[in-house]
Design a protein with these regions (language model features):
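Absolute protein N-terminus
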Residues: 1, 22-23
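Bacterial N-terminal signal peptides that target proteins for export
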Residues: 1-8
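Bacterial N-terminal signal peptides
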Residues: 9-17
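N-terminal secretory/targeting leader peptides
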Residues: 12, 23-111, 120-327
Length: 327
């Protein structure tokens, strides 16, 4: 074999080795590519790709890999590497996660950002670690109320109304305020209001717009200076998979995560304001929730949702107190 042939073989072997060593991570989520949750995941993927550390993140949007509520178990088993996931979906496996969709625990987006780096969230992450799961990007999204015939700002406003809530804890609180509950996905709110089945609804800011609820309601209470509905929807990763990456890959991933987290917070705030603009444009009255109304809701939540959570989970009171202690 001559020197030229040997050189070609050596170069080929090096190229093949580089190809083999490039690791691909699979990231799953339930939303379209236009959604903010896809966009922040894409920021992480793009940053990792540009770092040239032999690591690629392939995103599977729109429920194309797993059904939304079925992503947590595959993540814990290493069958899925990463997911943008509303953590309360896994509240059946880990009851503590239900605190990440609990009425009145988060007041606004800046409060949510403090919650992300609080002793409360540290405890939640310790529980995740027992399932071999870790957080890559923190983030909460907010929501509000809409009323077919009147504004829904305080507890008295829902008395006697057929209401849709986003999450079991919110349903429990609304029943405590005197509402009747009609359980349905947010995609069904429009028709339910149109046919008179529903008089009030609670969902995320983005869902209010994407499902055109502004065509069916008289008044909208958005997430403003105070809001009742916040849902923790982080980017999670299998912990063992992260630890299997080399130092450069880990650093690139977390640098991308830092950029994505800042974007996610800014866009979450923009979504709330964008929903206000759309409802206003369509002639819907806008009425924000006052601090006193927020406190009135929280008082009812303490006697309903919080009490139910604590009674069903032995470590519930300690974790609830930690969450309530975040200023």
């Amino acid at each position: 074999m001559n020197f030229k042939s040997l050189s070609i073989m050596t170069i080929g072997a090096i190229a093949l080795s580089a190809t083999v060593s490039a690791k691909e991570l699979r990231l799953s989520h339930q939303w379209s590519t236009k959604d903010v949750r896809h966009k922040f995941a894409q920021i992480v993927a793009d940053h990792v790709a540009s770092a040239k550390v032999d690591l690629n993140i392939k995103i599977f949007p729109s429920k194309s890999l797993f059904k939304p509520k079925e992503q947590y178990k595959p993540l814990t088993r290493g069958q899925l590497d990463m997911t943008v996931f509303p953590l309360s979906y896994a509240g059946g496996q880990q009851p503590a996660y239900n605190l990440t969709l609990m009425p009145g625990l988060v007041k606004n987006h800046d409060h949510a950002a403090r919650m992300n780096y609080s002793p409360f969230m540290e405890e939640i992450q310790k529980i995740m670690a027992t399932d071999d799961v870790m957080v890559v990007v923190h983030g909460y999204l907010a929501g509000g109320f809409a009323g077919k015939d009147k504004c829904i700002t305080g507890p008295n406003d829902v008395k006697g109304l057929q209401t849709r809530a986003a999450g079991k804890a919110f349903e429990t609180m609304l029943v405590g305020a005197g509402a009747s509950i009609a359980s349905m996905p947010s995609s069904a709110i429009y028709n339910a209001m149109q046919t008179g089945v529903l008089q009030a609804a609670n969902t995320s800011s983005s869902s209010f717009v994407s499902y055109r609820i502004y065509e069916q309601v008289k008044c909208y209470t958005p997430a403003g200076k105070t809001a009742l509905w916040f849902m923790y929807q982080p980017l999670l990763m299998n912990k063992s998979v992260f630890e299997s990456l080399n130092k450069n890959q880990q650093e690139a991933l977390m640098a991308g995560a830092k950029k994505a987290e800042a974007y996610y917070l800014a866009e979450a705030k923009k979504e709330d304001q964008a929903s206000v603009n759309v409802f206003k444009k369509n002639g819907v009255e806008i009425k924000e929730m006052s601090a006193d109304e927020f406190n009135a809701w929280r008082s009812i939540a303490k006697e309903t949702s919080y009490k139910k959570f604590v009674s069903g989970y032995k470590d519930g009171q300690r974790l609830l107190d930690l969450a309530l202690s975040v200023n």
